[in-house]
A protein has these predicted regions:
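Accessory nucleic-acid engagement/destabilization modules that flank
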Residues: 1-93
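N-terminal pre-P-loop "Q-motif" helix
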Residues: 108-140
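Hydrophobic anchor at the beta1->P-loop junction of P-loop NTPases
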Residues: 144
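Conserved lysine of the Walker
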Residues: 152
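Conserved helicase/translocase motor-coupling segment
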Residues: 156, 286-291, 312, 316-477
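Conserved RecA-like ASCE ATPase "motif II neighborhood" in helicase/translocase motors
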Residues: 202-269, 447-451
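Signature of the SF2 helicase/ATPase Hel1-core->accessory helical subdomain module
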Residues: 235-323
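C-terminal accessory regions
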Residues: 275, 448-541
């Protein structure tokens, strides 16, 4: 109901959205259920009715007539209010689930490589563990670890879209099985945005199997909420889960526990059985409140009154045994081969060495030389314009290639290097990664940089990293004294370590190469430039 007598485009879009979202995300309102239509009524509206998919616009004098036109009990079985509002009704419609699964299996996701030959053994082991948990009707924490670029995200997405889970699902409160028994959850907002943007071709805005952790926790932590309609909860970058202090701050709930505690609680409410899959990376804790690591999951399991089973790579065994939690070790659940960079075996080791407390320059130079022989390009420059020109020429005949600007979120001088422009609109990350160069928001324009927060978990073919003054070499040591400071209430335990992790992420986003730019006018970067040259970087041009 609108009362201003005007028709703004956003009025129509907002109203149509209500119907579309019910069509997609209400199990009784999709293609297989009752058709939902929105009627947008405006007082003072004088034009004739406008009818389109999902939406009719009319004036108040004709509202009764429009409602009568939609009163067609012979066309479909009426839906009772009780059924419409049932706890487990808010699930994607079966037709949408079918469409998204088909889309995922038939379409390549440009930012997520299909690497079945490397991940096949791990996926098979995860499926076996899920089937066993269903058969024994238990609760299980399954940990899947891997080096950067090993395919953890792909494993999680593949499991989330598996059709066999339909056969294992249990009846919910409405005596019906969940339509989407698994969900891929990530606290990495940009990753969620990009995945949803690239999956939206199937409908449902790409949100059927991919959701954000924060919203999920907020929804199912409410006292009146039912159990999650999923038997498999896939937590991406589980080592970065928020501790209790961070959850309380972000959810404004003084009694909240940690995210691992929340997921243990959710799993115990799911009918019959549930598997929580934690995808584990390392050295990527770049947010405040993420520094507790895998130990929080051991604490959450140890404090539960329900019998849990934990299976994962042997490297985590001691963490759980220290909490008296039984642990089954399996090397099948560790992805040791990086496939993100087909030229770049050794890049992760080089980047880790670069940001370490005591870098071995001679060893780093040797690794850089080996990378160059394999075809990976580690270049350095003090001229941003030359670096941009190099990338535009390099990829001029490869329109599908992706290259872009990166920077550190704590660099106070970035505004002196490049114009960051106006405040970005919501939803800009998906187009930044996916859109072609003629789109103003495309990464290929080399106009807008992304930070470690937008880059983590994602990749480009080539990156141009603007090195900041927040992490510089000073008399042979890394120095973060010029970094933009954290708020006093942020609870940061080790800001220098967060800078190390951030730059490690920034250095490892390119599949084929990285150009590191240390602007000439920033003389405080002189020693850092010399350090990179000594560590094996080739000076551009």
């Amino acid at each position: 109901m609108k009362g201003d007598g005007n028709w703004q485009p956003e009025y129509r879009e907002q109203a149509a959205d209500y119907a579309r979202r019910l069509y997609w995300f209400h199990r009784y309102c999709g293609e297989d259920g009752v058709r939902v239509h929105t009627v947008l009524v405006n007082y003072g509206y004088g034009e004739s009715d406008d009818e389109r998919d999902f939406l009719t616009t009319t004036r108040v004098e004709k509202l009764a007539e429009v409602i009568e036109r939609f009163d067609q009990p012979e066309a479909a079985q009426p839906l009772s209010l009780e059924r419409f509002l049932s706890v487990d009704a808010c699930q994607p419609s079966p037709s949408l689930v079918r469409a998204v699964r088909s889309y995922f299996s038939e379409h390549a996701l440009p930012r997520i490589k299909r690497i079945d030959q490397v991940t096949q053994k791990t996926v098979a082991r995860v499926i076996t563990e899920i089937r066993e948990t269903h058969a024994t009707r238990k609760r299980k924490l399954l940990l899947v670890s891997g080096v950067p670029g090993a395919g953890k995200t792909y494993v999680g997405l593949q499991i989330a879209h598996e059709r066999f889970l339909d056969d294992l699902a249990e009846m919910g409160e409405s005596d019906e099985k969940p339509t989407a028994p698994a969900v891929f959850l990530s606290g990495n907002g940009p990753l969620v945005e990009v995945l949803q943007y690239e999956l939206k071709g199937a409908g449902g805005e790409g949100r059927v199997f991919v959701r954000g952790v924060k919203d999920f926790v907020e929804k199912y932590s409410k006292k009146r909420s039912g159990p999650p309609p999923h038997h498999v909860l896939i937590f991406d970058e589980a080592q970065r889960a928020w501790d209790a202090e961070r959850v309380r701050l972000k959810h404004d709930d003084p009694t909240a526990g940690s995210e691992p505690e929340a997921f243990v609680s959710f799993a115990e409410r799911v009918p019959g059985w549930c598997v929580v899959i934690g995808l584990i990376g390392g050295g990527q804790e770049i947010h405040v409140g993420e520094e507790g690591g895998i130990g929080m999951w051991a604490d959450a399991i140890a404090s539960s009154e329900t019998a849990w089973e934990v299976t994962g790579p042997k490297q985590f065994e001691s963490v759980f045994e220290a909490k008296c939690v039984a642990f089954t070790a399996s090397d099948d659940l560790h992805l040791s081969e990086s496939v993100r960079f087909h030229f770049a075996a050794g890049l992760s080791e080089w980047a880790t060495g670069i940001v370490s407390e005591k870098p071995d320059v001679s060893k780093l130079a040797t690794i850089a030389k080996e990378l160059a022989i394999k075809g990976y390009q580690l270049r350095i420059t003090r001229a941003l314009r030359e670096a941009k020109a190099f990338l535009w020429k390099k990829y001029a005949d490869l329109p599908d290639a992706r290259f872009g600007l990166l920077h550190s979120s704590r660099d106070k001088r970035i505004g002196d290097v490049i114009d960051l422009g106006p405040r970005r609109r919501f939803g800009w990350i998906g187009p930044w990664y996916a859109d072609p160069e003629d789109s103003p928001g495309s990464c290929r324009r080399l106009a807008q940089p992304i930070s470690e927060f937008e880059a983590q978990g994602l990749e480009l073919d080539h990156t141009l990293l603007i090195w900041g003054t927040d992490f510089v070499r000073t008399e042979g040591f890394w120095d973060d004294s010029s970094a933009r400071s954290y708020r006093s209430k942020s609870g940061v335990r080790d800001p220098l370590q967060l800078r190390r992790n951030a730059y490690r992420v920034l250095l490892t986003r390119g599949r084929e190469g990285v150009i590191i730019c240390l602007p000439k006018f920033l003389t405080e970067l002189d020693e850092t430039f010399d350090f990179f040259v000594a560590s094996g970087c080739e000076v551009l041009n």
